[in-house]
UniProtKB/Swiss-Prot annotation:
The lineage of its organism: Eukaryota, Viridiplantae, Streptophyta, Embryophyta, Tracheophyta. This is Small ribosomal subunit protein uS7z. PROSITE patterns: RIBOSOMAL_S7. Keywords: Acetylation, Ribonucleoprotein, Ribosomal protein. The modification N-acetylalanine is found at residue 2. Belongs to the universal ribosomal protein uS7 family. The gene is RPS5A. The keyword Glycoprotein does not apply. Expressed in epidermal cells of root tips, lateral root primordia, root hairs and shoot primordia. InterPro entries: Ribosomal_uS7, Ribosomal_uS7_CS, Ribosomal_uS7_dom, Ribosomal_uS7_dom_sf, Ribosomal_uS7_euk/arc. GO terms for cellular component: chloroplast; cytosolic ribosome; cytosolic small ribosomal subunit; endoplasmic reticulum; plant-type cell wall; plant-type vacuole; plasmodesma.
Length: 207
């Protein structure tokens, strides 16, 4: 009897100790489907679980350290673009929180999983770079590293949401939710997916 009481107490302790994003979304049941991006999308419950996407970490001090930043925080930071939004982290956190609530209402899935799927689907795998010095310049197709795929995906997703919300009756949180849901499905309604296909098409032409 004492043993079962101890087990119950242990389970209760685990439940109370679990860190959930905005006290709602669990990190335990999320996974990264693309094996090459596992090390670059920070969602491990032991390392990256936070109540709010604001860790105040110094991720830009050293090269590649930003790969250790929780992925939801990277999305939040990327929303603080265009001069008038610089440094408004509280606003960015609020946008992400509302977008996650909308995603949960529309898709009934864990919004953290939707964000991960959107990033996996939106990162281009091939790009064209300029080769040659002054005079003759040609473009050559190159593979993209996993970290740059994640960086590009986050940039394209937030850019798409920002452009959709500009001069629109919809709030940016609604636009971000739509963008993430469409990108997670791989739908061409997503700005990020369209841009990714365009980048890969140009690269294919320059192989």
């Amino acid at each position: 009897m004492a043993a079962s009481a101890e087990i119950d107490a242990e389970i209760q302790q685990q439940l109370t100790n679990e860190v959930k994003l905005f006290n709602r979304w669990s990190f335990d049941d999320v996974s990264v489907t693309d094996i090459s991006l596992v090390d670059y999308i920070g969602v491990q419950p032991s390392k990256h679980a936070t109540f709010v996407p604001h860790t105040a970490g110094r991720y830009s001090v050293k090269r590649f350290r930003k790969a250790q930043c929780p992925i939801v925080e990277r999305l939040t930071n990327s929303l603080m673009m265009h001069g008038r939004n610089n440094g408004k982290k509280l606003m960015a956190v609020r946008i992400v929180k509302h977008a996650m609530e909308i995603i949960h209402l529309l898709s009934d899935l864990n919004p953290i999983q939707v964000i991960i799927d959107a990033i996996v689907n939106s990162g281009p795998r091939e790009d064209a770079t300029r080769i040659g010095s002054a005079g003759v310049v040609r473009r050559q197709a190159v593979d993209i590293s996993p970290l740059r795929r994640v960086n590009q995906a986050i940039f394209l997703l937030t850019t798409g949401a920002r452009e959709a919300a500009f001069r629109n009756i919809k709030t940016i949180a609604e636009c971000l939710a739509d963008e993430l849901i469409n990108a997670a499905k791989g739908s061409s309604n997503s700005y990020a997916i369209k841009k990714k296909d365009e980048i890969e098409r140009v690269a294919k032409a320059n192989r």
